[in-house]
Each structure stands twice: as C-alpha cells, then as structure tokens.
C-alpha cells in the first residue's frame, strides 16, 4: 500500500468508500505492509480487518490501528462497513507529546472498542479532523505552517480520544511494558534477525539469563526464547505474505544459514510450511 500525503501535509483523512473508489480491483484484499500509520474508525455496519494475520472486528465505535511495518489486509466484506480512515507519517506528530509517544509505541494495541461514554468525544474528534483536513486542502498554500500545525493538534486529540477506550489484551500487545522486560523487547526488535540466543540479549542488557527469564515471565508469561522465536516467525510471515522474496533469501535475512532449517523452524512455530503459507495468503487475497 503506497501513500504520499498531499504537500505540505503528512496526514490524510478520507472515508473507506473513497479508498475503495481509488483502489484497483483486488488491491485492498491483497497483503500490504505500509510504512505509515493507518487508523480505521467504524461509523456503521460491520466488517473485519486483518493485521499481522489476525482478524479484528470493526463496527460502530470500534477502531483498528495499523502501525508501520505491520502487514494488513482489507476484507472482502468491507462494503458492509462505513468508516473513516486517517493515514499519517511516523514523524508527523509533535515530538515529546503524549500522542506522539502513543504512536511511537510499536507494540501498542491494534483494536479499540469505545464505550458509549467515550464514543461521543471520539466522533467529535474525528469529525473535526475530517473537516479541518478538507478546509486545509481548499484554503492552504504550499508550506502553510499554521494549517500543518492545526492538523497535528487535531490528530493528537483524535489519538488521545481513541486510546482512552479500553484495548483488549487478546490482540497480543504488551502496551505500557517497562523495566527489564521492556528493554529486552526493544532490543529484540533491533536484533531478532541476527541474534537468536537468549544469552546475547542477557549479556547486552547486563543481566543473567535467569533474571531475564523471570522478568519476561512475570510481564507476559513467556520465556525470552519464546519471545525471540515468535518475533522471528512473525517477520518471516510478513515477508512471505507481502514480499516477492524466495524462501532462501528470507531465511538468510533472518539469520538462518540453511533454508531447510528455516523451513523446519517456521513449520514448528506456525504449523504450516513457508511455501504453503505463502500460497494461502495469495489465495485468500483473491477469494470473493
């Protein structure tokens, strides 16, 4: 999914219906890995949205946040859904603000379900952003700093309203993690493709493997080894679904010298062979 925000902005607001009109047939149901943030905020109707191979419901009061680097796919039944979309670049928000910190959390929740008490304020925030964006397109001159700043603040309000809603833990996020577990998680994000052993992470963090294991099990009920294997398998699945790379270069890029060892690992982690997983993703993209 490609996105270039209209100059001079790093944000775009549209409806799902408008996106469907712009996209060629079959484009939206194919796996995409955007380098920008995508918020999908349901207005009425029901549909599902796939993010990193999990389906999330979208309806009135439900929102989905796709973060840069995640693989996402629109469902074939999204014509039943009316929704607002907000697309924005990772560096658009004001640094040092709460909204920017929320957006920068790559482990943040995917789905949000707003209660009646918070839905009104969320609806107001997204309506105001939509109107502000339309006004900016009509009236702003290239390089208009005031309009850009206004859109940054309107988007910040929307994010704060959205994240005030409870986020189910079932989406696999570990939002708000700190301490040793949080530092391990960040280091894992940096090194998972080159370091598969727990000892590497414990050494870099300055702790014993046992101490690191206690920290992760307390935080998320997983061992460091389980977290390492899950992260490698997720990246492999993303590349198999979205890229055209053959299995061998994917394996090499993830630190496997032997493609057969990678295939064994992926099958053990996911229950399906890499080539079969790729075929399934391609077939699901073309199903009506």
Annotate the PLM regions.
Residues 218-259, 279-288:
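Terminal helix-turn-helix DNA-binding modules in bacterial transcription factors
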């Amino acid at each position: 999914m490609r996105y270039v925000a209209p100059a001079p902005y790093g944000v775009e607001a549209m409806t799902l219906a408008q996106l469907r009109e712009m996209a060629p047939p079959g484009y939206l149901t194919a796996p995409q890995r955007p380098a920008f943030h995508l918020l999908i905020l349901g207005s009425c109707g029901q549909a599902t949205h796939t993010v990193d191979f999990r389906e999330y419901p979208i309806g009135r009061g439900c929102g989905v946040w796709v973060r840069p680097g995640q693989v996402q796919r629109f469902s074939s039944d999204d014509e039943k859904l009316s929704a607002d979309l907000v697309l924005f670049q990772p560096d658009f928000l004001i640094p040092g603000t709460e909204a920017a910190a929320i957006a920068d959390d790559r482990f943040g929740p995917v789905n949000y379900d707003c209660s009646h008490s918070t839905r009104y304020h969320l609806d107001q925030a997204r309506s105001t952003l939509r109107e502000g964006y339309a006004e900016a397109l009509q009236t702003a001159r290239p390089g208009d700093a005031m309009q850009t700043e206004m859109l940054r603040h309107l988007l910040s309000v929307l994010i704060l309203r959205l994240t005030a809603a409870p986020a189910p833990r079932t989406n696999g996020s570990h939002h708000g993690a700190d301490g040793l577990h949080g530092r391990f998680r960040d280091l894992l994000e940096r090194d998972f493709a080159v370091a598969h052993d727990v000892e590497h992470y414990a050494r870099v963090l300055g702790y014993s493997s046992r101490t690191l294991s206690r920290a992760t099990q307390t935080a998320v009920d997983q061992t460091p080894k389980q977290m390492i294997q899950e992260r490698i398998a997720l990246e492999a699945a993303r590349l198999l679904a979205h890229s055209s790379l053959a299995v061998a270069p994917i394996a090499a890029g993830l630190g496997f010298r032997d493609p057969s060892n990678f295939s064994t690992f992926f099958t053990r982690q996911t229950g399906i062979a890499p080539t079969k997983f790729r075929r399934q993703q391609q077939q699901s993209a073309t199903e009506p």
